[in-house]
Amino acid sequence: MVMVRITRVHTGGGDAGETSLVDGSRVSKSDDRIEIVGTCDEVNALLGLVLMETSRLPDNHPDGGARTTVRRVKDVCLAALGRMQSELFDLGAELACPPDQIPEYMQLVDQEDSDRLCEEMDAWNEELEPLESFILPTGSGPIAAMHLARTV
């Protein structure tokens, strides 16, 4: 895979309300594609927050007993969330290309990736008790961060 080297985080080229796509062409910052790229970036940052908050949770109770739920989240969900972050990054890069000019080296998010995500959500949902009401967005740091990510 070819990595793009970013030498600075701003160019000043967007000051007139336009931004550049991967091929250098210019589009309005209000273009739907740019909105979606921004949403991918926002969800990606929020998943990073979930990962950071989850990594802070202790594996054991103060009495020394195992916290099996925390360990399960760390073992199963963190790997999936990390993969989702990579896929969101890939999706944002793909969206920042004109459809007919996607570089061959670019990693694309495909139907298999989408199907895997749906299968994971279905499997996780099977483990939950049936919901009888809406869930208030409260709880520990990882839970609050996940609620925030869910709203984007």
Residue ranges and their predicted role:
Residues 1-152:
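Phosphate/pyrophosphate-binding loop motifs in nucleotide- or prenyl diphosphate-using proteins
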